[in-house]
Amino acid sequence: MAAPEVLESDLPNAVALLKNLQEQVMAVTAQVQTLTKKVQAKAYPTEKGLSLLEVKDQLLLMYLMDLSHLILDKASGGSLQGHPAVLRLVEIRTVLEKLRPLDQKLKYQIDKLVKTAVTGSLSENDPLRFKPHPSNMMSKLSSEDEEEDEAEEGQSGASGKKSGKGTAKKYVPPRLVPVHYDETEAEREKKRLERAKRRALSSSVIRELKEQYSDAPEEIRDARHPHVTRQSQEDQHRINYEESMMVRLSVSKREKGRRKRANVMSSQLHSLTHFSDISALTGGTPHLDEDQNPTKKRKKIPKKGRKKKGFRRRR
C-alpha cells in the first residue's frame, strides 16, 4: 500500500483522537483553574502537605510538558534523534518507577488521612483504635493505694520515702502489635489455587508424563533416602557397640515404631495405586487426599467408676 493511501486511512482516526484530546484538555484546564482559585483563597490548607505527593505532582507536570514538546516537534516533521526531551522523559519515568514502593507503603496512611479529613472522625473498624493507650495501663487500685500511702505518710511524718506500691513503672510496649488484615476471600482462594497448581506440577504423575513424552535421554539413578541412610548408620553403630561391649541393648516402643514407619516409607508397594491430585490443572476443584489429611486416632480415656484390676492375695 502506498504512503498516501496509508495517510488517508489513518486520517479519520487521527482527527477523532485530536478532538478527544482537545475535549479532555479543556476539562482538565477548567478543573485545574477551579482548584487554583480555591488554593489561592486558602480554602485548602497546603502548608502541612506531604512532600512526596508534591514531588510527584512536579514530576508529572514536567513529564507532560516534555511530552507535549515532543509531540509538537514530531507533528512538525522534525527528527527525534538526540532530542533533549527524550532524555528528560526517560529520567522522569525512571524516578516515577522508583517511587512506586513508597506509594505502596504510604497508601494506607494517605487514604486514612483523606478519609478522616472528609468525614472528620475515624471509622469504628479503624485498626488504630486498637492501639495501646498508656493511660489505660494505670490501675485504679494502684492509684488508690498511692493516695492512702501518701495520707498515712502525711499523718505519721516518720519518713519521706514513698511506698513501692504506687511507684510509676516504665511503659513497655507489647511485642504483638495489632495489624490490619485486609486480605479478601478471593485473594485467599487465589493463593490456595496457586499452591494446588504448584503441588500438581511437582507430582509424580506429571513428572512421569514429562519423562514419557520428552526427547531427552532417560537418566537412571540409584540412591537411598536420607532417613534410610541415617537408620542404617544407627543400626551399624548399635551392632558395633553390642559386639565390642558384649551387651544386648534394649529397644523402646518408640524406637520400634519409628523403625516400622521408616520401613513403610522406604517401601514402594504402598504407592502403586496412589495418584496425586492434579485437578487444579484440569480446571476442577482440588481436594485433600487421605494422605494429606490423615484422621487422628482417639485416645482411650478410662472411666472414673472402674477400678484397676489387681492380684488376689492367697491365703
Curated annotation (Swiss-Prot):
GO biological process: maturation of SSU-rRNA from tricistronic rRNA transcript (SSU-rRNA, 5.8S rRNA, LSU-rRNA); regulation of translation; ribosomal small subunit biogenesis
Residues recorded with modification N-acetylalanine: A2
Acidic residues bias locations: 144-153
Region feature Necessary for interaction with EIF4E, mapped onto this chain: 41-174
Chain segments annotated as coiled-coil in the UniProt record: 5-42, 181-205
Recorded GO CC terms: axon; chromosome, centromeric region; dendrite; filopodium; mitochondrion; nucleolus; nucleoplasm; small-subunit processome
Amino-acid biosynthesis recorded as keyword: no
Subcellular location: Nucleus; Nucleus, Nucleolus; Chromosome, Centromere; Cytoplasm
Residue numbers spanned by region Disordered: 123-174, 252-315
Record bears the keyword Acetylation: yes
Modification sites for Phosphoserine: S121, S142, S143, S204, S214
Domain of life: Eukaryota
Compositional bias annotation for Basic residues: 295-315
Ranges of compositional bias, category Polar residues: 264-276
The entry's keywords: Acetylation, Cell projection, Centromere, Chromosome, Coiled coil, Cytoplasm, Nucleus, Phosphoprotein, Repressor, Translation regulation
Subunit field text: Part of the small subunit (SSU) processome, composed of more than 70 proteins and the RNA chaperone small nucleolar RNA (snoRNA) U3. Interacts with CPEB1 and EIF4E.
Family named by the database record: Belongs to the SAS10 family.
Described purpose of this protein according to its UniProt entry: Part of the small subunit (SSU) processome, first precursor of the small eukaryotic ribosomal subunit. During the assembly of the SSU processome in the nucleolus, many ribosome biogenesis factors, an RNA chaperone and ribosomal proteins associate with the nascent pre-rRNA and work in concert to generate RNA folding, modifications, rearrangements and cleavage as well as targeted degradation of pre-ribosomal RNA by the RNA exosome. Its dissociation from the complex determines the transition from state pre-A1 to state pre-A1*.
Protein name, UniProt field: Neuroguidin
Species per Swiss-Prot/TrEMBL record: Bos taurus (Bovine)
Source species taxonomy: Eukaryota, Metazoa, Chordata, Craniata, Vertebrata
